[in-house]
């Protein structure tokens, strides 16, 4: 008998069943990586552009003369403005508006406040005084002394 761990026969690992996985999407190259310079020279590029305009016009009109249609559209809708020369100063994006006029005074002489002491308050305000009973805005020293004496 062998009681040592080293002498025991090792059991094999239990294989796990494979998990279903979603296939990876194919790698799509970016558009900037697929661009290459044109293979035509300048007259060939101009010819291809003219034919593309002619065929796009033929997609909605059967007259075959897209140049006259472009001229009619330009006359009817207005031509685009001419480009500014390079290095010209940029015009201001938003023009400054003049200040708004002062609002009209809707109540030049407001009536007195309705309620108790309203008539006196209105008269006091008109005479340069403040307060609900037409008196002074700030209490005098005598009023404060009387108030503190009543508190004691």
Swiss-Prot record:
The organism's place on the tree of life at top rank: Viruses
Chain positions covered by the region annotation Disordered: 1-28, 75-152
Residue stretches in coiled coil: none
Biased composition (Basic residues): 1-13
Listed Pro residues bias regions: 15-26, 80-92
Acidic residues compositional bias, start-end: 133-152
Name of the protein this chain belongs to: Uncharacterized ORF2 protein
Taxonomy of the source species: Viruses, Viruses incertae sedis, Anelloviridae, Alphatorquevirus, Alphatorquevirus homin4
